[in-house]
């Protein structure tokens, strides 16, 4: 039983953590205002795995711990091919939209603060992004995660269609050149 807990801890050690937002919130009650904190955190291994978590607590360190723990439970696998994403995708969350486009090697990460944090920890080195609509950090992070979740791995697409991976990419290039 204990070995399972140890294995999980070892698995989590490779993840890098970033705090995106720390927000002070208050609840007004009969006895006055109850202050608490909301933290948005991102974890990733810079090799195709990234997670987002939200933590709430009366103290900042406790909220950070909860956010990181939640992020480790919500890990998503991202298909990264030659340091970029396989195709263009739009992620949406409430009033926020994030456009994610693959980029040529050497382009780097063209992204704002929140989107940049998510993309860096996912292990993407070349990408073009554009944030549209609301710039709320939580919604931008969630929109980016939704976009990354919707990416299709070319190997899986090729297997489903019973064609080679090269043929999948030929179709993409033909559409872009037309």
Swiss-Prot record:
InterPro entries recorded: Ribosomal_Su5_D2-typ_SF (IPR020568), Ribosomal_uS5 (IPR000851), Ribosomal_uS5_bac-type (IPR005712), Ribosomal_uS5_C (IPR005324), Ribosomal_uS5_N (IPR013810), Ribosomal_uS5_N_CS (IPR018192), Ribsml_uS5_D2-typ_fold_subgr (IPR014721)
One Gene Ontology term, aspect cellular component: cytosolic small ribosomal subunit
Keyword Ribonucleoprotein recorded: yes
Single GO BP term: translation
One Pfam family in the UniProt entry: Ribosomal_S5_C
Any one GO molecular function term: structural constituent of ribosome
S5 DRBM domain location: 15-78
PROSITE patterns in UniProt: RIBOSOMAL_S5, S5_DSRBD
Keyword match rRNA-binding: yes
UniProt keywords, alphabetically: Ribonucleoprotein, Ribosomal protein, RNA-binding, rRNA-binding
Entry superkingdom: Bacteria
Complex formation: Part of the 30S ribosomal subunit. Contacts proteins S4 and S8.
PANTHER family linked to this entry: MITOCHONDRIAL RIBOSOMAL PROTEIN S5 (PTHR48277:SF1)
Family the entry assigns: Belongs to the universal ribosomal protein uS5 family.
Domain comment quoted from the record: The N-terminal domain interacts with the head of the 30S subunit; the C-terminal domain interacts with the body and contacts protein S4. The interaction surface between S4 and S5 is involved in control of translational fidelity.
Function: With S4 and S12 plays an important role in translational accuracy. Located at the back of the 30S subunit body where it stabilizes the conformation of the head with respect to the body.
The protein's name: Small ribosomal subunit protein uS5
Organism: Thermotoga maritima (strain ATCC 43589 / DSM 3109 / JCM 10099 / NBRC 100826 / MSB8)
């Amino acid at each position: 039983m204990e070995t399972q807990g140890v294995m999980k801890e070892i698995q989590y050690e490779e993840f890098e953590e970033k705090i995106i937002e720390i927000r002070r919130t208050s609840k007004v009650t009969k006895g006055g205002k109850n202050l608490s904190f909301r933290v948005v955190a991102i974890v990733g291994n810079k090799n195709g795995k990234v997670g987002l978590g939200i933590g709430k607590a009366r103290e900042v360190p406790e909220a950070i711990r909860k956010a990181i723990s939640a992020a480790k439970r919500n890990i998503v696998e991202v298909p990264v091919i030659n340091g970029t994403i396989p195709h263009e995708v739009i992620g949406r969350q409430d009033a926020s939209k994030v456009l994610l486009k693959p980029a040529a090697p050497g382009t780097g990460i063209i992204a704002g603060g929140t989107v940049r944090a998510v993309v860096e920890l996912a292990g993407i080195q070349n990408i073009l992004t554009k944030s549209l609509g609301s710039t709320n950090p939580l919604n931008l992070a969630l929109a980016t995660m939704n976009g990354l979740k919707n990416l299709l791995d070319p190997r899986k697409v090729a297997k489903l269609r019973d064609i080679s991976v090269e043929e999948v990419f030929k179709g993409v290039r033909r559409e872009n050149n037309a």
